Amino acid sequence: MLNYYMQKKCKICIKNHEIVVSLKNTATAELIWKSLPFSSDINLWGEEVYFYTNLSSELEDDAKDIISFGEIAYWPSGKAIAIGYGKTPISRSSEIRLADKCNI
């Protein structure tokens, strides 16, 4: 048997920049996919861009607060999507540390 799963992709537009992201196969990613398109104002926290959404999702078992460059996170307690690209005010050394555990 051959199963084919097409990876879902979406585009995040921030001013004159476009970021195409591949969504993981998670409940949170599916929730985001079903809510597209939506708009929000961006905010900065150190070297993190985040924007609020109207989405509600529970914290997933593999949620984490330290991410790798290029990972997109959903912050359930803040109802926001975060894109960390460098140090935040609470980072230690060169890590990308988010304010709280987030779904990746």
Segments (PLM) and residue ranges:
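Long, hydrophobic N-terminal alpha-helical segment
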Residues: 1-39
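Glycine-rich active-site loops that engage anionic ligands at enzyme catalytic sites
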Residues: 25-31, 35-104
